[in-house]
């Protein structure tokens, strides 16, 4: 009987003692749920992060710092991407650019070491060539002027922190030479690749036109040289013919003078006409006509004419 009253008290005591424990565990559970909520959200944000950070980070651009400088080399992996991208795009025209890059990355990881080394060796050779060209470029006046401008602007930025903050807030970029903004091009994007393709196609077209023009120019130069040689040859022949013509004219004039002097003592029968330089042709025609009409009568005249002609021929022909 004495234990009867204690049982309710004992029962109530554990009940009352258990209630605070349950309440406390409930509060802890609620706190844990509230604490786990943000952690789950944080985890979700971490899981979404790789999706947001595909490609080159937003707001960052690869810059071509050196105007007119040597082209920076690419890695062996990038050389592999450039070589295989068009093949994949031709085979899968509807595949987006990130998926193509993903496929190429998987293909690169499975590539045989010997084949992969080929791209790495080519990249190393290109890097050595770039370093050689870069050292030569750094000795040029253009690079020195550009470096001076960059240093001056850097000093101005350090002296004026407020100006730097305003520049950063306004989205301006400092420390570049004049005209550098044209070289801020994000690479490995569709626009960049398409622009490169268009420029390379234009360069190929211009090179082809240049070769065609050079060939035409060479042909025209050969024609010009041939025509010049022909003209010189014709000019020489013309000068020779002019000299011959002058000599013949002088010889003809001497023969006419000799004939006029020799036939001055032989008048035309029946008319008594004697020749002069201006009438020699008419005189010879009339003399020939008179002899033909009666050759027997003018035998002595014929003999004399033959003697005169033989003498003139021996002296002037």
Swiss-Prot record:
In the UniProt record, the gene name given for this protein reads HMG20B
Please list the residues that carry the modification Phosphoserine. 160
Q: Name one GO biological process term.
A: regulation of gene expression
Give residue spans, biased composition: Basic and acidic residues: 31-52
Coiled coil ranges (UniProt) are 190-257
Q: Where is this region: Disordered?
A: 1-71
Q: Which InterPro entries does UniProt cross-reference here? A: ChromReg_NeuronalGeneExpr, HMG_box_dom, HMG_box_dom_sf
Q: What is the lineage of its organism?
A: Eukaryota, Metazoa, Chordata, Craniata, Vertebrata
Which Cys pairs are S-S linked?
none
Return the PANTHER family for the record. Answer: HIGH MOBILITY GROUP PROTEIN 2 (PTHR46040), SWI_SNF-RELATED MATRIX-ASSOCIATED ACTIN-DEPENDENT REGULATOR OF CHROMATIN SUBFAMILY E MEMBER 1-RELATED (PTHR46040:SF2)
Check the record and name the CDD domains matching this protein.
HMG-box_HMG20B
GO cellular component, alphabetical, reads: chromosome; nucleus
Q: Where is this cross-link: Glycyl lysine isopeptide (Lys-Gly) (interchain with G-Cter in SUMO2)?
A: 31
The name on file for this protein is: SWI/SNF-related matrix-associated actin-dependent regulator of chromatin subfamily E member 1-related
What is its biological role? Required for correct progression through G2 phase of the cell cycle and entry into mitosis. Required for RCOR1/CoREST mediated repression of neuronal specific gene promoters.
- Any idea which residues the entry calls the DNA-binding region? 70-138
Q: How does it assemble?
A: Component of a BHC histone deacetylase complex that contains HDAC1, HDAC2, HMG20B/BRAF35, KDM1A, RCOR1/CoREST and PHF21A/BHC80. The BHC complex may also contain ZMYM2, ZNF217, ZMYM3, GSE1 and GTF2I. Interacts with the BRCA2 tumor suppressor protein.
Q: Transcription as a keyword?
A: yes
Q: Where in the cell is it found?
A: Nucleus; Chromosome
Q: Where is the composition biased (Basic residues)?
A: 53-65
State the species of origin.
Bos taurus (Bovine)
One annotated GO molecular function is: DNA binding
């Amino acid at each position: 009987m004495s234990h009867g009253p204690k049982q309710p008290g004992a029962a109530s005591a554990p009940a009352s003692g258990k209630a605070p424990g349950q309440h406390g565990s409930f509060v802890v559970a609620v706190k844990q749920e509230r604490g786990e909520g943000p952690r789950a959200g944080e985890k979700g944000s971490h899981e979404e992060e790789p999706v947001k950070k595909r490609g080159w980070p937003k707001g960052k651009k690869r810059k071509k710092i050196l105007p007119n400088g040597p082209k920076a080399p690419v890695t062996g992996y990038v050389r592999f991407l450039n070589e295989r991208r068009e093949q994949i795009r031709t085979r899968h025209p509807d595949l987006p650019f990130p998926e193509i890059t993903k496929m190429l990355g998987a293909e690169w990881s499975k590539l045989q070491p010997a084949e992969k080394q080929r791209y790495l060796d080519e990249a190393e050779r290109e890097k050595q060539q770039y370093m050689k060209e870069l050292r030569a470029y750094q000795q040029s006046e253009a690079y020195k002027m550009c470096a001076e401008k960059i240093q001056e602007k850097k000093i101005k930025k350090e002296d004026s922190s407020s100006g730097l903050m305003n520049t950063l807030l306004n989205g301006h970029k400092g420390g570049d030479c004049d005209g550098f903004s044209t070289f801020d091009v994000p690479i490995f994007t569709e626009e960049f690749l398409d622009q490169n393709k268009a420029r390379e196609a234009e360069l190929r077209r211009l090179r082809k036109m240049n070769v065609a023009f050079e060939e035409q120019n060479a042909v025209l130069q050969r024609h010009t040289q041939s025509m010049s040689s022909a003209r010189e040859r014709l000019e020489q022949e013309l000068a020779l013919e002019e000299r011959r013509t002058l000599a013949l004219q002088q010889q003809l004039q001497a023969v006419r003078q000799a004939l006029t002097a020799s036939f001055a003592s032989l008048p035309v029968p029946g008319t008594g006409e004697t020749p002069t330089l201006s009438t020699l042709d008419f005189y010879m025609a009339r003399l020939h006509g008179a002899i033909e009409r009666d050759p027997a009568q003018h035998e002595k005249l014929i003999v004399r004419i033959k003697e005169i002609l033989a003498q003139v021929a021996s002296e002037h022909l």
